[in-house]
């Protein structure tokens, strides 16, 4: 060393819990070779077996799959699923371990640290420790294990020699564990579940975890089952404040959804988040959006009260009225339009169209026609039935409550949620 500076200062990372200094420690890790897995997934994506809804994120997924490095799946943290890897203790004397015990047996190459609770943290290699401590005692208090890169291990326990083995303390990368969710939850559940539900029709998640969770599920799911775990991926964006800024506590612009529900209702929150949203794009939202959605739910209630009152006060007129045909054509077109938008996963656009048509056509025009005896009671009632069915995915609580209150006025089905999706405006209930 040519020169030292005793006044030199540097930054040292500290544990956020105990404030002990943290120092980088190069260690052997476990990896998955991803190139063969990625090539198989890419081949199926190219064949059209997967559709990504999300503003160009299909290209992002393709980029990740074609530029993958081997995947490090081992983590040196406590919380997680321990790697199913075992070492033969006597055959691996260079494995370093640290364990808790009530006993203190010092020796060459053994480090002992006393704790306030009367226990000791003992560290050393198995070769140095086993003459002083039993393997059972080491395993019972095991805190960490560091194996050399070339240490021999086994992946399946043998009951005959399990007492001579010690398990790896590393845990799986959380994305590796969660990547198995689509098939692991079905394979070990009720008989027939896997065959019926795998592959899933749609996965909905945020675009920010596309390369972490979605891609990992594709790699592992296809490797284990030979099939992609889902046929479509719908990616939503981040929810930002009304100025388009990311929400954070420091900025003070965080919207608490529970406060919104208490003030405007769960349906208002749901509709405000969905309307005019675009897959893969961030969405700005603010107080005005919640108010507008709340006003929509009020409008639905008012329309339902009108129809209920209509059935209480007026007699049925079976004669065609001037606006009947125009109304039927309009509602049939709306059913076709909304169904098509939902089939294309243009959910935000569907909500926007429904808001406009329910408010400005059904409430502002059709109800006025009915008041002026230009539209039959039967059709305005059927129109409300269809509107409730179309609006139900977006405002489920209000529409279901209204359906229950109106009863047979709008249909014989007990639940709106299980009623058949409308195909056209029929003239019978």
Name the predicted role of every residue range:
Residues 20-43, 161-189:
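Conserved oxyanion/phosphate-binding beta-strand-loop segments in alpha/beta enzyme cores
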Residues 64, 68, 73-75, 79-175, ...:
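Gly/Pro-rich turn-and-neighbor structural signature
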Residues 87, 165, 241, 274, ...:
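Acidic, turn-prone loop/beta-hairpin segments
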Residues 71, 128-172, 180, 184, ...:
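Flexible, glycine/threonine-enriched loop-and-boundary segments that flank and lead into catalytic domains
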Residues 53-90, 120-125, 132-133, 169-176, ...:
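Structured ligand/cofactor/substrate-binding pocket environments in proteins
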Residues 225-227, 304-317, 407-411:
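Proline-centered turn/helix-capping motifs that create local helix->coil transitions or kinks
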Residues 1-96, 110-118, 125, 245, ...:
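Residue patterns forming the tRNA-binding/recognition surfaces of aminoacyl-tRNA synthetases
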């Amino acid at each position: 060393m040519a020169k030292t500076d005793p006044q030199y200062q540097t930054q040292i990372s500290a544990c956020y819990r105990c404030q002990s200094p943290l120092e980088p420690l190069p260690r052997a890790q476990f990896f998955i070779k991803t190139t063969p897995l990625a090539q198989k997934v890419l081949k199926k994506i190219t064949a059209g077996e997967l559709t990504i809804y999300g503003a160009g994120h299909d290209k992002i997924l393709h980029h990740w799959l074609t530029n993958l490095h081997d995947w490090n799946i081992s983590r040196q943290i406590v919380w997680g699923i321990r790697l199913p890897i075992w070492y033969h203790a006597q055959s691996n004397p260079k494995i370093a371990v640290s364990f808790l015990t009530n006993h203190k047996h010092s020796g060459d190459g053994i480090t002992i640290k006393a704790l306030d609770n009367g226990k000791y943290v003992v560290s050393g290699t198995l070769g140095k420790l086993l003459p002083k401590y039993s393997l059972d005692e080491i395993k019972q208090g095991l805190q960490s294990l560091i194996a050399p890169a070339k240490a021999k291990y086994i992946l399946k326990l043998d009951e005959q020699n399990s007492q001579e083995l010690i398990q790896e303390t590393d845990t799986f990368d959380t994305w590796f564990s969660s990547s198995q969710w689509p098939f692991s939850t079905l394979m070990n559940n009720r008989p027939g579940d896997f065959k019926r539900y795998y592959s899933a029709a749609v996965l909905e998640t945020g675009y920010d975890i596309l390369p972490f969770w979605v891609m990992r599920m594709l790699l592992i799911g296809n490797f284990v089952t030979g099939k992609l775990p889902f046929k479509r991926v719908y990616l939503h964006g981040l929810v930002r404040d009304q100025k388009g800024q990311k929400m954070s506590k420091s900025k003070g612009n965080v919207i608490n959804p529970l406060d919104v529900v208490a003030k405007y209702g769960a349906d208002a929150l749901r509709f405000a988040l969905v309307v005019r949203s675009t897959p893969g794009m961030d969405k700005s939202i603010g107080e005005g959006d919640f108010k507008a959605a709340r006003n929509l739910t009020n409008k639905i209630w008012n329309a339902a009260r009108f129809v209920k009152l209509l059935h209480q006060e007026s007699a049925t007129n079976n004669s065609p009225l001037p606006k009947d045909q125009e109304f039927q054509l309009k509602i049939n077109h709306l059913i076709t339009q909304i169904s098509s938008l939902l089939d294309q996963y243009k959910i935000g656009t569907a909500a926007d169209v429904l808001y406009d048509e329910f408010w400005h056509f059904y409430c502002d025009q059709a109800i006025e026609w009915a008041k002026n005896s230009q539209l039959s009671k039967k059709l305005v009632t059927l129109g409300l039935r269809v509107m409730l069915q179309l609006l139900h995915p977006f405002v489920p609580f209000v529409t279901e409550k209204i359906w229950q209150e109106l009863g047979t006025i709008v249909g014989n089905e007990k639940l709106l949620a299980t009623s058949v999706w409308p195909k056209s405006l029929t003239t019978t209930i």
